Amino acid sequence: MSLATETTDLVGPFRSPHNTAAEAKGSIHDDATATKLGFKGGTVAGSLHMDQFVPQLVEIYGGEWWRKGNLSLYFRQATVHGEAVRTFARRGSPHARLWMENEAGDLIMEGTASCSGSDPDSELTHRLKGQATADPGALRILAKNKVGDEAKDVALKVTRAGLEQRLKTVPEAMPEYSGDQPFLPPSMQVALFRAAQENIIKLSGRAVGLFGAIELQSINGPPRAETDYAGRFKILALSESPKTENIWYQAWAADPKTGEDVASMVMYLRFMKASSDLWN
């Protein structure tokens, strides 16, 4: 059943995103691996769905959203290649409420957006406060990590070729994604940080991971393609559930010349215990 109740809700069109990582064997995006772990098929990365919200955010906040905007989403249900979904946005203060539904009205993700700098009550800030710390010895996949671990001076960059590859399947094309200094859509902002993730997360053995939630914050944005950034990372929390081991980390991208932060990301990753030999 849809959550849309107000005539002022902004409703996007149904889009059917591509599972662009379907050929990544052994990942959650691979049909064989995903179905073995109980999913209905290889999953579409939640970061790809984030691009669908951009037209509504620009309608609510104008072009300033690219410079100071926040997008914070918690992923409720995975989708598969070609599954139709649409976005909803409800204006509000201090932030707008966002969610995504499939054609059956199932909730795919929910969260917040704002345009006044860091949001102290964003979706992920709220959820991070409720995280119970894993007991000592409870983690196996993530046993080598600890809260407060950091990585600094990490080179970050998205090439124009990488951006152009994404734009072949982006669900909502925006003029800002082209030109001499193209903006990065949310999915490619995530890719900017994720490409260097091994600098902060140390896995014991192999395990299949999936996105649990992502928050993007433009500080002096937007981040752009073909631009060098200096990255730093910090682990915020470690937790576990009967099925997963979980890690929260934050990453920042700064101008290497001035040291001024351009953008940041908070990432919540879940690693499936059933995918690890350490749990079987």
Regions found by a protein language model. Give the residues of each.
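HotDog/MaoC-like acyl-thioester-processing domains
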Residues: 1-15, 80-145, 220-280
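Residue-level "contact hotspot" at macromolecular interaction interfaces
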Residues: 42, 72, 78-80, 222
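Short coil/loop residues immediately preceding or within conserved phosphate-binding loops
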Residues: 70, 95, 211-213, 248
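Short structured motifs
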Residues: 70-75, 213-220, 235
